[in-house]
């Protein structure tokens, strides 16, 4: 779809728009899946996420900084 295709430059296809990303909350347990196609890293379960291919994504999952 348009959302996915507009952000593919060498990255995995499962990329979500910021609008959809903000509606999801990262689980506190490391390795737990979250709805935007990321999972939490073992060493940074409070926010830093990897995509399902294991590449670190340089953003913090929504809902983690204050909870």
UniProtKB/Swiss-Prot annotation:
Expressed by the venom duct. Residues 1-21 form a propeptide. One of its GO terms (molecular function) is toxin activity. It is found in: Secreted. Keywords: Disulfide bond, Neurotoxin, Secreted, Toxin. It comes from the Eukaryota. Contains 4 disulfide bonds. One of its GO terms (cellular component) is extracellular region. The cysteine framework is XII (C-C-C-C-CC-C-C). This is Conotoxin Cal12.1p2. It comes from Californiconus californicus (California cone).
